[in-house]
């Protein structure tokens, strides 16, 4: 369960980075 939460957090962080690059 913790692994799933960690993976989701990492994916969310990557998604934010991609979104930031797209916004820039």
From Swiss-Prot:
Induction details: By iron deprivation.
Protein localization: Periplasm
TM region(s), chain numbering: none
Protein name, UniProt field: Iron-regulated 31 kDa protein
GO annotations of cellular component type: periplasmic space
Source organism: Haemophilus influenzae
Domain of life where this protein originates: Bacteria
Purpose: May be involved in iron uptake.
Keyword terms, alphabetized: Iron, Periplasm
């Amino acid at each position: 369960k913790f692994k799933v939460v960690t993976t989701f957090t990492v994916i969310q962080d990557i998604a934010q980075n991609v979104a930031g690059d797209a916004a820039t």
